[in-house]
Every structure is written in C-alpha cells, then in structure tokens.
Amino acid sequence: MAGKTLYDKLWDSHLVKQRDDGSALIYIDRHIIHEVTSPQAFEGLRLAKRKPWRIDSIIATPDHNVPTTSERKGGIDAIEDQVSRLQVQTLDDNCDEYGITEFKMNDPRQGIVHVIGPEQGATLPGMSVVCGDSHTSTHGAFGALAHGIGTSEVEHVLATQCLVAKKMKNMLVSVEGQLPFGVTAKDIVLAVIGKIGTAGGNGYAIEFAGSAIRDLSIEGRMTICNMSIEAGARVGMVATDEKTVEYVKGRPFAPKGAEWDLAVEAWKDLVSDADAVFDTVVRLDAAQIKPQVSWGTSPEMVLAVDQNVPDPAQEPDLVKRGSIERALKYMGLKANQPITDIQLDRVFIGSCTNSRIEDLRAAADVAKGRKVAATIKQAIVVPGSGLIKEQAEKEGLDKVFIEAGFEWREPGCSMCLAMNPDRLGSGEHCASTSNRNFEGRQGAGGRTHLVSPAMAAAAAVNGRFIDVRDLIQL
C-alpha cells in the first residue's frame, strides 16, 4: 500500500463523514473572517435563530475596505464610501454581539487576514483553515489544509464548524536547486503559473517541495502558497519542518508548555511519505528562474524581465492567439515590445502576497539612496499588519521609503483590488506585488503587472521595468 501525501493526511485527520455523492464533511479548526464576506453569513444565522458553534475558533479583522491613509485615524465614521463604512461597522457589531476575537480597524494587530493569522499563531501546522477569501491557501505554508470558501459556506462553518467539500487530486510542484541572486519566492510562483497555466491546478491540491522551497523562509513559502489559486488550485501547501516550528513558537495563539511539546511531536508527521504517489508532478530548475513580470491580463501571461511581449502572429493556436491579441489591446502594448520598455505610472508594494517584513526589507534595500522616478505618479508601500508596520519603523524602513519618494501607509488590502480609495486610473500601468492582474482588478481600465517587492522598487526608481540585479550587488 502506497504512503500518504501531506494532503491525504490532513484530509483524513479532518474527515467527519464521507457521503454517497462523493462529497464529504470535514471539520474546521480555524475560521478567519473579514468585513466583505461575513455580513450575509451572520444575517443568515439570525434568520435561522442560530449562533456560531465555536466562538474560540474564529478571529476577525477588517482589511479589504479600510483606508490606508491618515483618514483611518478618524475611525469608521471617517470612511468616505458608504458601503465600505457599513461593512466595517457590521463586522464590529457582529463580533461584539457574539464575543468573537476581532482586531479592529485601529488595533495595532489589525491587518490583512492572511498576514495576521500566521502572525498571531492562529494558523498552526495540521490545522484546517477557512476564510471567505480565495487566498486562504496562504496558510498552507504551515503544513495546514487551507482554502477559501463562499459566503454561504461561511455561514455553514459558523453554524456547524464543518464544511461540505470534495477531496482533490494530488499535485507535486518540485523546485530543485539554488535560486540565483535576486530571484525570490514571488518569481518562483509566477514561473510555476507561467509553466502550468491558470487552469493547471484545477481539481488539485498542490504541494510545493524541493530544495529551493525548503530553502525559503516561512514568509517566502506563504507567498508561494498564496498564489496557488492563480495556478487553479484552491489548496497549496508546504511540509512542516524546523523553520515552521521556529516561526510559530511563542506567538499569542500558539500552544504553551506541555501542550507545545505534544504539538511539535505531532507536527513531525506533517510531511508526505517517501512512497506517496502524486497524480501529477511538475518540476522546475531553480537555477533557470529569472525575475518575472506579468505582461497581460492573466497571471499565466508572465515572462522573465529580459524577454519581449509575445507576438500573436507566432501563436498557432487560434484561441491562445485571440487571448494574446485581447490582452495586448487592453494593456496598451505592442507585439515583441521588450518588458523593459513598458512605461509605468504607479507602483504598489503590499497585499497578502508580499506585505510582510521580509518583503519590505527587500524593497527598502533597492530604494535606499535612490529616488522614485519623476515619471511615476505614485509609489505606495502598505504593510500587511500594524505589527509589521511597527517593526519596519523600528528598523527605519519607513524613512528609507519616504526619503526615496514612496508613500508609507497604514495596513490593509489597499491597491490589490479596487474596493477602497487606493486604485488605478484608466490606462495606468502599475508594477504591483499583488496576485491578480485581470482587467479592472486595481481600478477600471487599470493595467497591472505582477512582480516581486524588489522588482517593484526597482521599477519605481527606474520608471520602467529593469532587472533588479542590475541595481543591487551580491
């Protein structure tokens, strides 16, 4: 009998009941909620005269709609948009009513859900974690079973602590070798998506493995797992190791004392067995990966910074040719145009993909002693949480960014999506450390280019894309 994959083990340990239709009922250990997908769920509970089943499993914070400027100091009443204001207030009201732990808008622990969960130790190895947000796969970096759910499922988990789900197939993405200098976790995951496409992971849980993945920090692994959904997979994960344990140790929600010792012992099994069989295996050579830049309207439309935008005339597949033509038109680019010739208008460093302290340090290393190019209308840096902001300010990173001409903001989802005041104007090109680049994602008519934090900072000071390795030294 073949061994089990990490996903198999996590699934089996949370399986409550297998159903005749092929679906199953699984138990949920951690439920994270925010202001956008939870209001309807709580209203559904009230209409059914139910209450949340397990209050201590839930943590909450507003992130999508909160302003990242000084406006937020005025509290909820200072939020200009009426819908955003109502959603943030409703989250507060619901959490207050049921006694749910919430890091409110001006709490120093507030931040993006997928940043604060791990930061607080609320995400632990071996857990099942859900949130009404597709980038919940981020938490899989801890050897956890984590994925996004819809609003009706948010209500179901609140009411029952269980979720109806169907087991996925297993995919292994193995990245072996040493990453070249200046190449990051973001470049790895963009390269993976470029290789398998945005539908490549459909129906799979992806385990990221190999020496290049093991060499990454936990923050880097979170970046990788965060964008599993852009590869088509709801679930992405990395096996637990000493780095995982060290990251979790001592955090507010982490086990203490004898419970900690028991947990660490149990976590040792959160790896795929040596004889486990995967349905699909994808391999990448880390040494061949270069800094990546997305050029089109899908994360799979991505190239190395030293390449040229594709020519649709060279694409034999008519469907793909049409997609390239539409993307070029929307993005305002020409066939065979060098990536380094793309003129930028704005730069955004932040999001649940790349707003952690490691990301800010990487961007600051590039920005230090330089100035944002005169052609850049705006360059903003948005920490993923209040605690990350505090740490960055202790290290003087805020001063580095401000002196270079960046705006230093309060935590939130910000320009990742056009649900708050931070957004692109029509036709504007943005170098963004976020995760999605489809039409209108950052604002109606906005043109998004996905890059790493270091590449975004390099683009800010250069005005166009440039290989960050041309600016920094070994």
From Swiss-Prot:
**Which Pfam families does this UniProt record tie to the protein?**
Aconitase
Which UniProt keyword terms apply here? 4Fe-4S, Amino-acid biosynthesis, Branched-chain amino acid biosynthesis, Iron, Iron-sulfur, Leucine biosynthesis, Lyase, Metal-binding
Q: Which molecular-function annotations from GO does this UniProt entry contain?
A: 3-isopropylmalate dehydratase activity; 4 iron, 4 sulfur cluster binding; metal ion binding
- Give binding positions for [4Fe-4S] cluster: C352, C413, C416
Q: Which domain of life is it from?
A: Bacteria
What does the record give as cofactor? [4Fe-4S] cluster
How the cofactor is bound: the record states: Binds 1 [4Fe-4S] cluster per subunit.
Against InterPro entries, the record matches this protein to: 3-IsopropMal_deHydase_lsu (IPR004430), Acnase/IPM_dHydase_lsu_aba_1/3 (IPR015931), Acoase/IPM_deHydtase_lsu_aba (IPR001030), Aconitase_4Fe-4S_BS (IPR018136), Aconitase_4Fe-4S_dom (IPR036008), IPM_dehydratase_rel_enz (IPR050067), IPMI_cat (IPR033941)
Kinase as a keyword of this entry, yes or no, is no
Q: In which pathway does it act?
A: Amino-acid biosynthesis; L-leucine biosynthesis; L-leucine from 3-methyl-2-oxobutanoate: step 2/4
Q: Which enzyme class, named as a word? A: lyase
Catalyses: (2R,3S)-3-isopropylmalate = (2S)-2-isopropylmalate
GO biological process, alphabetically ordered: L-leucine biosynthetic process
State the EC number(s). 4.2.1.33
Cite the record's note on assembly.
Heterodimer of LeuC and LeuD.
Job of this protein: Catalyzes the isomerization between 2-isopropylmalate and 3-isopropylmalate, via the formation of 2-isopropylmaleate.
Family as reported in the entry's similarity comment:
Belongs to the aconitase/IPM isomerase family. LeuC type 1 subfamily.
Q: What is this protein called?
A: 3-isopropylmalate dehydratase large subunit
Read off the lineage from the record: Bacteria, Pseudomonadati, Pseudomonadota, Gammaproteobacteria, Pseudomonadales
